[in-house]
UniProtKB/Swiss-Prot annotation:
Alphabetized GO MF terms: dihydroorotate dehydrogenase (quinone) activity
Annotated source species: Verminephrobacter eiseniae (strain EF01-2)
Cofactor note: Binds 1 FMN per subunit.
Enzyme class, UniProt record, top EC level: oxidoreductase
Annotated active site: S183
Higher taxonomy: Bacteria, Pseudomonadati, Pseudomonadota, Betaproteobacteria, Burkholderiales
Family annotation (CDD domains): DHOD_2_like (cd04738)
Protein's name according to its UniProt entry: Dihydroorotate dehydrogenase (quinone)
Gene: pyrD
Swiss-Prot/TrEMBL cofactor(s): FMN
GO biological process assignments: 'de novo' pyrimidine nucleobase biosynthetic process; 'de novo' UMP biosynthetic process
Length: 360
């Protein structure tokens, strides 16, 4: 368990502006990783190996994209007990994102609203940081997902060019690549979830992936991250499109633009994506509908509203194969990672993924 109980540090962090606290933590993790300071947040990884999309994961609990946008803290995050970490979202060129303030806590709801807008240092810096990871260089069992998007200045008609540029850049470093087409904080980005736009984008991705697989001698799985604000008909069309283009999995879900559950709370009317406890039910519903549309064997990573071990289990029962945490980490601390992984392991064969025997 972590040597520094999160309950002691959370009041200090919550006394800061939400984004300032985020930046402080990222900076501390980046500076402290690979030093004795890392013991302050180190957890033992729960040994619950599974295989999905041709990849072996140490356990089913991962970190969602958005926390480590520039891949600065992979080694530190890997020490928290995650089975996989997803870094990004990265865009081809560096961009500042939307004006501040742009991240807000809703403590009563155990939620966050953000409208960051893919603020990141760009693809070149992202790849440089990936190359500095000792875990990656040492062949760690930790799986690494790299989440890619488009620059705000790129016209939607040319969006595929940004995704292709990022795919090309991150491909040698990724265990899987995630296409973020569902952030509500880049204007019109969610139109890429429409049938025709998605068909065009995924066709281009599939073609480029085939070229890269031949060049690098390995086929990197591609996942698509979707919104919770889609109806069943939209999900059915999307499922068919994903399968038609040989996409390897779906990440369900991103943040929501719906505010019904948090009406009346401070910051509830701020624009942006809502994450945390209020998203759990909607996310689980989308997971269930996707599982029905995609069938038993199609990989689903469930994310949205995991604030406890029981919430993580609910994602698996809804139809997810793996789960990801982000806002829960902010409210509950690193101990949630191990708690969730242990609870899922205790399910035994109840989840949709077959557990593999431990390797000595």
């Amino acid at each position: 368990m972590p040597l520094l109980p999160y309950a002691l540090t959370r009041p200090f962090l919550f006394g800061l502006d939400a984004e300032a606290a985020h930046e402080l933590i990222i900076d501390l993790l980046a500076r402290g990783q690979r030093t004795p300071l890392q013991w302050a947040w180190c957890n033992q990884t729960v040994d619950d190996p599974i295989e999905l999309a041709g990849l072996r994961f140490p356990n089913r609990v991962g970190l969602a994209a958005g926390l480590d946008k520039n891949a600065r803290c992979i080694d530190a995050l890997g020490a928290m007990g995650f089975g996989f970490v997803e870094a990004g979202t990265v865009t081809p060129q560096a961009q500042p994102g939307n004006p501040r303030p742009r991240m807000f806590r809703l403590p009563e709801a155990r939620a966050l609203i953000n409208r960051l807008g893919f603020n990141n240092a760009g693809l070149q810096a992202f790849v440089h940081n990936l190359q500095q990871s000792r875990l990656r260089a040492a062949g760690s069992a930790l799986r690494l997902g790299l989440n890619i998007g488009k620059n705000a200045s790129t016209p939607m008609a040319q969006a595929s060019s940004d995704y292709l540029a990022c795919l090309e850049g991150v491909y040698p470093h990724a265990d899987y690549v995630a296409l973020n087409i569902s952030s509500p904080n880049t204007q019109n980005l969610r139109t890429l979830q429409g049938d025709a736009a998605l068909d065009h984008l995924l066709g281009a991705i599939a073609e480029r992936r085939a070229t890269l697989a031949a060049r690098h001698g390995r086929r990197v799985p591609v996942f698509v991250k979707i919104a919770p604000d889609l109806d069943e008909a939209q999900l059915s069309l999307m499922a068919a499109t994903l399968q038609r283009h040989g996409i390897d999995g779906v990440i369900a879900t991103n943040t929501t633009i719906d505010r019904a559950v948090v009406q009346g709370q401070r910051h509830a009317q701020e624009s942006g994506g809502l994450s945390g406890a209020p998203v759990l039910q909607a996310s689980n519903q989308v997971i269930g509908q996707l599982r029905a549309a995609l069938g038993k064997g199609f990989p689903i990573i469930g994310v949205g509203g995991i604030m406890s071990a029981e919430d993580a289990v609910s994602k698996i029962r809804a139809g997810a194969d793996l789960v990801q945490i982000y806002t829960g980490l902010i409210y509950e601390g690193p101990a949630l990672v191990v708690q969730a992984a242990r609870a899922i392991k205790a399910m035994g064969g109840c989840g949709p993924v077959i557990a593999l025997p431990n390797r000595s």
